[in-house]
């Protein structure tokens, strides 16, 4: 008896119908990392609850939208090396495991900074400043231990953070006072010794202002002339609604790219709340003073301001996309508005692409659309 073809026909028809249905389904919403996949990495700074998968609102956004990650605090000296002779890698290990599990380009932040560094680093047992030799030894031990632990896993390090004054001169930090200006060279040398393949960055804010930018340019030229392995400049990107202008941002990126280093936007957010004082910096101390006032949008961000924020992000990303050959990464400093450091005791801010409920804002669409403009 001839076998019936009916079941086979229905099976094939069902398969083809399924294929047709799948092909006809509209694509899902475009993500940030997909929109810029041919241009640069899209990163985000995350906190402990997020890399421990405890933030039910933020974690899905991180995994869907971003392909690079930076830790907010857990790799700063006071957290990872709180006492002489004692390191604590509990949280950094989890951070790196989170990044690897989600196939992210992992950044280490930060090795040498004057803030969030314990006093013992700079003092002897009597509370007096240590010698240059002792501080260099402590710096080297710290960098070799931390960077060496994650060799080949953390791909890029913010080696030195915020070493310049607003006029471009060297900031008089304990590092500079005890070691001298060459503490920066030493830090980069030690980081390269610990992981010769890692990208090494100098990171700072307000580099769009010409005096400070010129100081950073001189610093990078000096490092490169001495054969110091600096890979990239990190423009923090803590911007205002009216500063820097697109022209300033364009000129700044071009100036650093001309030096032969990669450019990173490392801590991007847009402060939309009017400040109580004229402050164009990301200095923690100054912003702590300003944070107690200027609560202009305590009941939510009005629609006109949402649209203004979207326009601001769009003009920034047009500049970034223009320089996509020189920019390696754009990292947002926080996931949702509620995560932002720009919120204060009496100051509610809205500087990011996702609101406090984890919903995309008009600014999100503006960033996506900026890359699609012809």
Residue ranges and their predicted role:
Residues 17-18:
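C-terminal motif of bacterial Sec signal peptides marking the signal peptidase cleavage site
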Residues 24-68, 72:
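Boundary/entry segment of secreted carbohydrate-active catalytic domains
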Residues 27-32, 119, 145, 149, ...:
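Aromatic-rich peripheral "rim/lid" segments of glycoside hydrolase catalytic domains that contact
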Residues 33-37, 56-67, 93-105, 147-151, ...:
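Acidic (Asp/Glu)-rich catalytic clusters
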Residues 39-43, 67-70, 105-107, 154-158, ...:
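Structural preference for beta-strand elements that scaffold enzyme active sites
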Residues 45-56, 77-90, 164-169, 206-215, ...:
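Acidic-and-aromatic substrate-binding clefts and catalytic sites of carbohydrate-active enzymes
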Residues 49-64, 137-146, 212-223, 313-319:
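Short, acidic/polar
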Residues 64, 68-82, 91-207, 274-275:
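Substrate-binding cleft and catalytic face of glycoside hydrolase catalytic domains
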């Amino acid at each position: 008896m001839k076998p019936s073809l009916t079941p086979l026909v229905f099976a094939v028809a069902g398969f083809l119908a399924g294929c047709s249905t799948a092909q006809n389904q509209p694509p899902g919403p475009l993500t940030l990392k997909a929109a810029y996949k041919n241009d640069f990495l899209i990163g985000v700074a995350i906190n402990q609850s997020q890399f421990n998968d405890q933030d039910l609102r933020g974690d899905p956004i991180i995994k869907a939208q971003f392909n690079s990650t930076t830790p907010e605090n857990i790799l700063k000296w006071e957290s990872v090396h709180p006492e002489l002779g004692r390191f604590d890698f509990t949280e950094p290990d989890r951070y790196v495991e989170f990044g690897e599990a989600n196939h992210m380009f992992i950044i280490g932040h930060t090795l040498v900074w004057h803030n969030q560094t314990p006093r013992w680093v700079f003092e002897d047992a009597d509370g007096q400043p240590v010698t240059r030799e002792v501080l260099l030894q402590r710096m080297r031990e710290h960098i070799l231990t931390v960077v060496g632990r994650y060799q080949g896993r953390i791909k890029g390090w913010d080696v030195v953070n915020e070493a310049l004054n607003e006029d471009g001169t060297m900031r008089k930090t304990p590092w500079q006072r005890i070691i001298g200006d060459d503490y920066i060279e030493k830090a980069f040398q030690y980081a390269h010794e610990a992981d010769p393949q890692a990208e090494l960055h100098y990171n700072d804010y307000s580099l769009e202002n010409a005096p400070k930018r010129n100081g950073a340019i001189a610093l990078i030229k000096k490092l490169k002339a001495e054969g110091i392995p600096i890979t990239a400049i990190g423009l923090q990107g803590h911007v205002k609604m009216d500063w820097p202008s697109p022209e300033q941002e364009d000129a700044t990126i071009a100036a650093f790219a001309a030096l032969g280093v990669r450019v990173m936007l490392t801590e991007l957010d847009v402060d939309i709340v009017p400040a109580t004082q004229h402050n164009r910096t990301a200095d923690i101390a100054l912003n702590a003073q300003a944070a107690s006032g200027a609560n202009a949008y305590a009941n939510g961000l009005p629609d006109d301001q949402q649209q203004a924020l979207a326009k601001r992000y769009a003009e920034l990303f047009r500049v970034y996309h223009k320089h996509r050959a020189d920019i390696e990464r754009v990292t947002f400093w926080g996931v949702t508005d509620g995560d932002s450091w720009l919120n204060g005791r009496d100051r509610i801010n809205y500087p990011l692409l996702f609101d406090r409920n984890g919903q995309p804002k008009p600014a999100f669409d503006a960033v996506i659309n900026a890359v699609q403009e012809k």
